[in-house]
């Protein structure tokens, strides 16, 4: 490929602390009425002094450890100065000169196999407020309203090195990061609600000439799919400009969900534009060795570790293990199921197909469903005892999922119990053979697929209730015995 994208990400993770970064207002403000979770501190009133949230610092250290970062025992807050309607203080409290962590990495499944994406820095900062645009888009709004509820909500910003080589890798990185912060319990990682936000910096290299375009920042990508789509669009836009011999402007562009294009928002700021200086009202953050050890002991088993254990302990293929451990709740559900039905691979197949299909259709987590390990115990028992076929099991599963009824109850209510009467099935096969001598002759002349005709006949006559394994056995016996 002649043109190669070079991508780095700047990710904001909203922390699930009880209170905001520097005041006692609630941090979970998503569903609150506008401007109801504010105080003099988070709205920057004269004389109000910030007090750092210890839980925010602990969550940042946990995340940094999970991302293999170097933790700095000394870090400091700074003021990032800029004007925007949703920033009442006129500055944002952040960490610029001395971040809490640097030099980490996250391993992902890249386009050419396993790869490390280096993390340049991880630092703490407070969120700004939120502009609500009439018309739901800044480019089409006739006016905007300001909601200050989000001011002061604690964030960690994670900045990667430009190690990402495709839009797909950017999406994979984001998905992996969300999985980690959810495992840690430091954030919901919900992009639709703004708990995980991603800005991407993309440039393009012409591998034939070595020429590299200017860097463009892309914002407003509020789902994993949009991260990939926006970067695909921007890559194509930059390539077309390079092919025309045009210079690519260094700017910030926003993804427009309606038109599926990026639109220019403003020129790209330089770091000097923000006039950073130390925050005089907050003392430095000093972490002891004892504190770091204490936090390290709180780390749970993370997705990669859990996937390796699933392969080792349950004999699962790597693909299964990664899918099951991508969600902490799904992994826990699988292990609970294994306790009552000790058939890991069969359970894995069901969870990765039938369960995930139902969850994705409803856009819910496994913990929000009515499904329990006992449902699988009952379902597998029905199949093992020959009372239902796997076909019937899959047909009733959506109702099991939706209603929470036991499979055996649904089977009984609908009269779906499998027919295992050998004499009845044999009579039906003989009848089919008498009525269709050509199919019999085809089978005997080597066209083994002709047996499918007799299977279909039996299933039609029994409304799909005949035991398929028993039916096939009887058909083979009668056809080869003639």
Curated annotation (Swiss-Prot):
A GO molecular-function descriptor: ATP binding
UniProt entry tagged with the keyword Ligase: yes
InterPro entries: Asn/Gln-tRNA_amidoTrfase_suB/E, Asn/Gln-tRNA_Trfase_suB/E_cat, Asn/Gln_amidotransferase, Asn/Gln_tRNA_amidoTrase-B-like, GatB, GatB_C_1, GatB_Yqey_C_2, Gln-tRNA_amidoTrfase_suB_CS
Keyword Lipid biosynthesis: no
GO BP: glutaminyl-tRNAGln biosynthesis via transamidation; translation
Reactions that this protein is recorded to catalyse: L-glutamyl-tRNA(Gln) + L-glutamine + ATP + H2O = L-glutaminyl-tRNA(Gln) + L-glutamate + ADP + phosphate + H(+); L-aspartyl-tRNA(Asn) + L-glutamine + ATP + H2O = L-asparaginyl-tRNA(Asn) + L-glutamate + ADP + phosphate + 2 H(+)
Group of enzyme by EC: ligase
Keywords assigned: ATP-binding, Ligase, Nucleotide-binding, Protein biosynthesis
Enzyme Commission designation: 6.3.5.-
SUPFAM superfamilies according to UniProt: GatB/YqeY motif, Glutamine synthetase/guanido kinase
Pfam families reported for this sequence: GatB_N, GatB_Yqey
PANTHER family for the chain: GLUTAMYL-TRNA GLN AMIDOTRANSFERASE SUBUNIT B MITOCHONDRIAL AND PROKARYOTIC PET112-RELATED, GLUTAMYL-TRNA(GLN) AMIDOTRANSFERASE SUBUNIT B, MITOCHONDRIAL
Biological function: Allows the formation of correctly charged Asn-tRNA(Asn) or Gln-tRNA(Gln) through the transamidation of misacylated Asp-tRNA(Asn) or Glu-tRNA(Gln) in organisms which lack either or both of asparaginyl-tRNA or glutaminyl-tRNA synthetases. The reaction takes place in the presence of glutamine and ATP through an activated phospho-Asp-tRNA(Asn) or phospho-Glu-tRNA(Gln).
Family in the record: Belongs to the GatB/GatE family. GatB subfamily.
Oligomeric form and interacting partners: Heterotrimer of A, B and C subunits.
Name by which UniProt lists this protein: Aspartyl/glutamyl-tRNA(Asn/Gln) amidotransferase subunit B
Organism: Thermotoga maritima (strain ATCC 43589 / DSM 3109 / JCM 10099 / NBRC 100826 / MSB8)
């Amino acid at each position: 490929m002649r043109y190669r994208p070079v991508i780095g990400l700047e990710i904001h993770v909203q922390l699930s602390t009880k209170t905001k970064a520097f005041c006692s207002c609630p941090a979970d403000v998503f569903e609150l009425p506008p401007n109801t979770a504010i105080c003099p501190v988070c709205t920057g009133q004269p004389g109000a002094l910030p007090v750092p949230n210890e839980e925010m610092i602990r969550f940042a250290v946990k995340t940094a450890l999970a991302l293999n970062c170097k933790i700095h025992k000394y870090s400091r807050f700074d003021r990032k100065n800029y004007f925007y309607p949703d920033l009442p203080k006129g500055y944002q409290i952040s960490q610029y000169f001395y971040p809490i962590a640097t030099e980490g990495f996250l391993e992902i499944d890249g386009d050419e196999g396993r790869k490390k994406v280096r993390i340049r820095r991880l630092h703490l900062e407070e969120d700004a407020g939120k502009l609500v645009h009439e018309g739901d888009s800044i480019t089409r709004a006739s006016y905007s309203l300001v909601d200050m509820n989000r001011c002061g909500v604690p964030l960690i910003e994670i900045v990667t090195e430009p190690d990402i080589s495709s839009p797909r890798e950017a999406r994979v990185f984001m998905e992996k990061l969300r999985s980690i912060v959810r495992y840690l319990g430091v954030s919901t990682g919900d992009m639709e609600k703004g708990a995980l936000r991603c800005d991407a910096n993309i440039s393009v290299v012409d591998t034939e000439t070595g020429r590299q375009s200017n860097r463009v920042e892309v914002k407003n990508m509020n789902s994993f799919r949009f991260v990939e789509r926006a970067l695909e669009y921007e890559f194509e836009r930059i390539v077309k400009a390079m092919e025309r011999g045009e210079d690519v402007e260094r700017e910030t562009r926003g993804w427009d969900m309606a038109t599926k294009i990026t639109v220019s928002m403003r020129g790209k700021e330089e770091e000097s534009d923000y006039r950073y200086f130390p925050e005089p009202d907050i003392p430095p953050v000093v972490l002891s060795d004892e504190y770091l050890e204490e936090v390290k002991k709180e780390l749970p088993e993370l997705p990669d570790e859990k996937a390796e254990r699933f392969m080792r302990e349950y004999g699962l293929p790597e693909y299964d293990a990664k899918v099951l451990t991508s969600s902490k709740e799904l992994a826990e559900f699988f292990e609970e199921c294994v306790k009552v039905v000790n058939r890991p691979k069969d359970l894995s197949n069901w969870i990765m197909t039938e369960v995930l299909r139902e969850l994705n259709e409803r856009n819910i987590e496994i913990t929000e469903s009515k499904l329990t390990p006992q449902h699988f115990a009952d379902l597998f028992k029905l199949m093992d005892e020959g009372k239902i076929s796997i076909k019937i099991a899959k047909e009733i599963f959506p109702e099991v999922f939706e209603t929470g009824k036991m499979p055996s109850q649904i089977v009984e209510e609908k009269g779906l119990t499998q027919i295992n009467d050998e004499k009845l099935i044999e009579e039906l096969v003989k009848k089919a053979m008498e009525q269709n001598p050509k199919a019999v002759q085809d089978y005997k002349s080597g066209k083994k697929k002709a047996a499918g005709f007799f299977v279909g006949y039996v299933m039609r006559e029994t409304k799909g209730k005949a035991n398929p394994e028993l039916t096939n056995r009887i058909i083979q016996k009668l056809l080869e015995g003639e």
